[in-house]
């Protein structure tokens, strides 16, 4: 752990040093430094907008008859028909519209990593995740008939449960209750869509089975959540990491 912390410290110091040097480097050129300028403004030695005047009679800026700025008939600024400023059909001005295009949304890597560690996030279920497949537990229901019924039909019951992260619940009972409800609902809807219905006995047995599976899922997720918090506390309490954080704060403030 100590060696890893020292390597992290060296990496961040090198990165921030390079960023600091880049910020101090003067940028070449800039506004009003000569060369090409905004259209219609002169410059000491650079390119200019096409010279004013010089056209024939009725040509204010060098275009043909009825061409105010050098375009064709009905072209106000040099574009084609229906092109206000030189772009194609429905384009308002070449690269200007490209600058205003919204940037693509960035994927939140933190959320992706969390979903991969905890389970697959199910779309359309409001943040529920689908746990890993489990072996269906061997259970007894108080009478031989239900025990036999379960053994003969256990493959019709779910072997995965839907759940939310454990930190969204106050206790195990709330987690298990929510887990049982959403799992049975999703399984019955999916199975009914395939043309198979469940009896009251199926629902009764399924509730017991899924409850046991949700309890197992809670214990697994609680242990992983506790281990993750403990590892984070140990990492951020080590002297090299404290020194690294202090150095980064100093660079940002300075």
From Swiss-Prot:
Region annotation (Disordered) ranges: 25-106
Topology of this chain in the membrane: Lipid-anchor; GPI-anchor
Glycan attachment residues as annotated in the record: 181, 197
One Pfam family recorded for the sequence: Prion_bPrPp
Highest rank taxon of the organism: Eukaryota
Lipid linkage positions (GPI-anchor amidated serine): 231
Binding residues annotated for Cu(2+) 2, in chain numbering: 69-71
Chief location of this protein within or outside the cell: membrane
Comp. bias (Gly residues): 52-95
GO terms under biological process: amyloid fibril formation; cellular response to amyloid-beta; cellular response to copper ion; cellular response to xenobiotic stimulus; intracellular signal transduction; learning or memory; negative regulation of activated T cell proliferation; negative regulation of amyloid-beta formation
The keyword DNA-binding appears for this protein: no
Chain segments carrying region PrP27-30 (protease resistant core): 90-231
Description of its domains: The normal, monomeric form has a mainly alpha-helical structure. The disease-associated, protease-resistant form forms amyloid fibrils containing a cross-beta spine, formed by a steric zipper of superposed beta-strands. Disease mutations may favor intermolecular contacts via short beta strands, and may thereby trigger oligomerization. Contains an N-terminal region composed of octamer repeats. At low copper concentrations, the sidechains of His residues from three or four repeats contribute to the binding of a single copper ion. Alternatively, a copper ion can be bound by interaction with the sidechain and backbone amide nitrogen of a single His residue. The observed copper binding stoichiometry suggests that two repeat regions cooperate to stabilize the binding of a single copper ion. At higher copper concentrations, each octamer can bind one copper ion by interactions with the His sidechain and Gly backbone atoms.
Function: Its primary physiological function is unclear. May play a role in neuronal development and synaptic plasticity. May be required for neuronal myelin sheath maintenance. May promote myelin homeostasis through acting as an agonist for ADGRG6 receptor. May play a role in iron uptake and iron homeostasis. Soluble oligomers are toxic to cultured neuroblastoma cells and induce apoptosis (in vitro). Association with GPC1 (via its heparan sulfate chains) targets PRNP to lipid rafts. Also provides Cu(2+) or Zn(2+) for the ascorbate-mediated GPC1 deaminase degradation of its heparan sulfate side chains.
Record-stated family: Belongs to the prion family.
Pathological condition linked to this protein in its record: Found in high quantity in the brain of humans and animals infected with degenerative neurological diseases such as kuru, Creutzfeldt-Jakob disease (CJD), Gerstmann-Straussler syndrome (GSS), scrapie, bovine spongiform encephalopathy (BSE), transmissible mink encephalopathy (TME), etc.
Descriptive protein name: Major prion protein
Species of provenance: Mesocricetus auratus (Golden hamster)
């Amino acid at each position: 752990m100590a060696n890893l912390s020292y390597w992290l410290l060296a990496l961040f110091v090198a990165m921030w040093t390079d960023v600091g040097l880049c910020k101090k480097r003067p940028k070449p050129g800039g506004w009003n430094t000569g060369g090409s300028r905004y259209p219609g403004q002169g410059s000491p030695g650079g390119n200019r907008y096409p010279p004013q005047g010089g056209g024939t009679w009725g040509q204010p800026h060098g275009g043909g008859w009825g061409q105010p700025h050098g375009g064709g008939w009905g072209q106000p600024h040099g574009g084609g028909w229906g092109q206000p400023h030189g772009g194609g059909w429905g384009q308002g001005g070449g690269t200007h519209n490209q600058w205003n295009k919204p940037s693509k949304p960035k994927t939140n890597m933190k959320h992706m990593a969390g979903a991969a560690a905890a389970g697959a996030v199910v779309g359309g279920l409001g943040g529920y995740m689908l746990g890993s497949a489990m072996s269906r537990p061997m259970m007894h229901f108080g009478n031989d008939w239900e025990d036999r019924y379960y053994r003969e039909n256990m493959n019709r019951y779910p072997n995965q449960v839907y759940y939310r992260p454990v930190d969204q619940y106050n206790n195990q009972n709330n987690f298990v209750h929510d887990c049982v409800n959403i799992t049975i609902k999703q399984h019955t809807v999916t199975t009914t869509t395939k043309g198979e219905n469940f009896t009251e006995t199926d629902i009764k047995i399924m509730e017991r089975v899924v409850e046991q599976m949700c309890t197992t899922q809670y214990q697994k997720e609680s242990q992983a959540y506790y281990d993750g918090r403990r590892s984070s506390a140990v990492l951020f309490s080590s002297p090299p990491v404290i020194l690294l954080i202090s150095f980064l704060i100093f660079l940002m403030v300075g």
